[in-house]
């Protein structure tokens, strides 16, 4: 351990520190309000809107103490409750934590280690993620850092004032360090219940220090002082202790049991790159972090000839192990509980920094020894002369000793150390930058998109529709974004759920509302019997089912008089395993944006070989898929492998006709396929069953742009027509738009058009894939929608979507290519404009 120098001999370290803190601030505030709040952040919003007394009452019934909510209450009074304002409090705690990493590491090890560890903390995806969340976890990590800082200062002060030989009449204690420990402990305990383990950890470390330094005396008074310190902490926590005991003993443990090596690998991934890491276990990039971690624990011999003090590696190691053991042994190993490990992220960065500088010193020392072949007097130190930090021994008379040369700093060792430093920082930074890029820009790893779901419901919801929140704990965050007129039902209302009461409520809701929008979140805890979704899947007609982060967003139609629908005979077998006996449609006509309801009556000819998926598709005259619904029978409630020969299963389906679908006649088909292989079951003539035609009509009111759910919402105006946006993905992978596109594949293009006037021409488009300046690799041309619905038939304000395929030739090499779009009246050379839609990646 070292004392932090009062004045730096150079301004460079201070400049590096301030630049690192600036980097930390930029990374924590960059796009901080871009992602939607998620459910737990909604709870924070609701708590912050209460009075301080109401917060205390509500927190007593929750698993989180009230301090963070109290601070957030005061914070929003000043800065408001926007996403940015709500999360800014955590961002500031995150910056404080980065500064604390420096203050701790500079005292535990040295300035060089502290600067490197601070840089690692500044760019840590784990710490950045929770710095951009309106929850208490970054504050928890920062308070743990404050406590570690107070402990280190406390021990350093004792190390200075304690006599080396145990003599002396009295010993003093650092008042500042004592105050820091007490305040940080009390604040931490009122922030999160796991902080009790942190207080126990620092107590253990202090006891180890006392045992190690017992020969320096004053053991009893030191233990008494620490005991009084703990009594003060307990006294101020006593008003909340009963609540804490009640919550900790009654809260359910819902962790999962996994092999220890798998858990450790996942935790390493989390500490290194946070919850959005895309690396697989065993990745070479994770090996870099593991290597630096091990090097950080190595007992390096310092430049002064001594081994590093045990506290410099034991404190950060225990600060990692204690929360990890708490999670693994306490039944808390679950994705939603691993955020408790954020308290270990800063100590992890300190050990990474120690691993870098420890090996740097080893390289410097090894190079110095290799070049030092001359007698000791020529190496800058006489044999037996004291090294820095060691007490001097009795020396011979000066006249009998040769003059000592000044110390020599070997340039080879310095260059080797700098090269190692550069390599280590780059190897840590590469996966870190990739992870941060995904976190900031990739919707696939974004938080639960309540903002988007609320906007969609606002755009498409009709006056008689309703919203179901399964679980009710989502209400706060959903109503943060949604202030529309539709009723919101939180189900199940009871905990544990009352199945009979919940089913009765669902039946009444379905009777009153023709369309339901469902937000399904944490259902294993709120609805472990799946009462809500199970009833809806068997009694309503599910139209969509998509993931919005960790929330499933579903839509249902609730037509109840299916017995009155015309029932069509089919009696068509699929590979002699399953037959479609009959089917019924709610109507042969439907408006775009509405749900076509379909009931399929399946009969098992034998026990099916596997669990098949049912598909229903609406096709245009070019066999382009306009609408589609793929799901197991009854959305998984009745898997086919459980069917018995002769059994008839009624399978309700809802097919959402996408807003903007052009008016016209479409073909409806259905069938089954093996989800493992994609292979369809076949009839005698085809691999699908033809269910006849469906007429799609123009809606009375054009859909708002929010209802289109466009992948790329960039607008371009072309005289009479505006392109509102477009979707691009490998054909057949609308549900996975990031599926790699390769040479020979079809790139599916969906264009969303709006007629700004009644068009006076039959407009066509040409889409080109271009390499370099203007080398065309592929192109597709045609009417904006189809020959059957030319733009001359469009009305002013009408929004229409066109579905097209662009063939990627086999000879196209992997790379990124420009996608261009032209509008013309049938002659591609007579264009009115050209726009660049972006770039398309062709993978290997």
Predicted regions and their residues:
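Serine/threonine-rich, low-complexity intrinsically disordered segments
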Residues: 4, 18, 162, 169-172, ...
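C-terminal luminal/periplasmic domains and tails of membrane-associated envelope-modifying transferases
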Residues: 455-467, 473-844
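Short, Lys/Arg-rich, polar N-terminal cytosolic tail immediately upstream
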Residues: 1-9
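Intrinsically disordered, low-complexity segments used as extracellular stalks/linkers
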Residues: 364-365, 396, 406
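Short, low-complexity intrinsically disordered segments enriched in A/P/G/S/L with frequent Arg
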Residues: 165-171, 373-375, 384-386, 390, ...
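Ser/Thr/Pro/Gly-rich low-complexity, intrinsically disordered segments
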Residues: 160-162, 374, 378, 407
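Terminal, non-globular segments
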Residues: 9-163, 172-365, 417-569
